[in-house]
UniProtKB/Swiss-Prot annotation:
Obligatory cofactor(s): heme b
Keywords, ordered alphabetically: Electron transport, Heme, Iron, Membrane, Metal-binding, Mitochondrion, Mitochondrion inner membrane, Respiratory chain, Transmembrane, Transmembrane helix, Transport, Ubiquinone
Species the sequence originates in: Arabidopsis thaliana (Mouse-ear cress)
GO molecular function, one term: ubiquinol-cytochrome-c reductase activity
Subunit structure: Component of the ubiquinol-cytochrome c oxidoreductase (cytochrome b-c1 complex, complex III, CIII), a multisubunit enzyme composed of 10 subunits. The complex is composed of 3 respiratory subunits cytochrome b (MT-CYB), cytochrome c1 (CYC1-1 or CYC1-2) and Rieske protein (UCR1-1 or UCR1-2), 2 core protein subunits MPPalpha1 (or MPPalpha2) and MPPB, and 5 low-molecular weight protein subunits QCR7-1 (or QCR7-2), UCRQ-1 (or UCRQ-2), QCR9, UCRY and probably QCR6-1 (or QCR6-2).
Residues reported in the UniProt entry to bind a ubiquinone: 208
Stretches in topological domain Mitochondrial matrix: 1-33, 109-116, 211-229, 315-325, 371-393
Ligand binding (heme b b562): 88, 189
GO cellular component, one term: membrane
Physiological role: Component of the ubiquinol-cytochrome c oxidoreductase, a multisubunit transmembrane complex that is part of the mitochondrial electron transport chain which drives oxidative phosphorylation.
Family from the record: Belongs to the cytochrome b family.
Identification of the protein by name: Cytochrome b
Transferase among keywords: no
Amino acid sequence: MTIRNQRFSLLKQPISSTLNQHLVDYPTPSNLSYWWGFGSLAGICLVIQIVTGVFLAMHYTPHVDLAFNSVEHIMRDVEGGWLLRYMHANGASMFFIVVYLHIFRGLYYASYSSPREFVWCLGVVIFLLMIVTAFIGYVLPWGQMSFWGATVITSLASAIPVVGDTIVTWLWGGFSVDNATLNRFFSLHYLLPFILVGASLLHLAALHQYGSNNPLGVHSEMDKIAFYPYFYVKDLVGWVAFAIFFSIWIFYAPNVLGHPDNYIPANPMSTPPHIVPEWYFLPIYAILRSIPDKAGGVAAIALVFICLLALPFFKSMYVRSSSFRPIYQGMFWLLLADCLLLGWIGCQPVEAPFVTIGQISSLVFFLFFAITPILGRVGRGIPNSYTDETDHT
């Protein structure tokens, strides 16, 4: 190719060459399984949420007297509005399902270990942003569960010493959840997804700095192939399966993952018998409720994210993949079962025996992160790379 042809080649242009480097020619370990397809699925979910959210915002009115009716207007009067709303509402659930599977895959294969510490920490930040975005989005329909969920969760900020009450007043825009709160939440709910896009691009760039982990947990620069067409085709299978799964929820069970009380307009004078957040918040909500003291519950929630952020810095792991670490593998499955149990406890009333079960489950959750550094020293498996001859004993 001549110098002139190189200059006008599409793949030599700055933007297209960057896309080609990261999405086409990106060297990928040849043994990646379908568990590595959830990253691209998460990106698809984010795009779905942004596109449907933009169209919903065209018809939504962020006012306490009109918000609930505007949602019903979307459902009844806007052409295709019911589809937009169900895609957006169930899309949030699909997004969290994909991300939870992505996180647990990372835990199982120790994708957080060196040199991918920054990738994992960015992922935790993205997860936290998702939680905040989903919570404030759940408030926007202004139903009973929206209003009382906002009241309960935002009041938790009052547990912060010195500045807690000031933060709550700032969040509310007054002395109670009202019109100012709804306007603030709508504005933030529109903004945060675009911040999520930026954080996701940073996450992808950080991943591509050192390359993807693999099921064996070993590092090699030799056994790699181009991402396109091999893993595009492999991811396509996951995309089709996801589309079928997503469609079943949208067309056959659009309200199963929601709460019926949210079809009742918000009434500050009537408290629901049982305030329950969306299902994807339930494990964290159960940990919050397991501690009677408000400040202790908030501290426990903060500790959850601190544990996740600290996980890559437990410098004690000689072997990454759980396939070669039977003790850690058992602890991983215990953690997964414990999180499912916490999710069930989160939707139960605050009474015996659910409180006790929640406290025990919360303790097991934190014990996993306390024991992980010790488990890294137990057992001996394959080396860090094909050429690593270092004796770790």
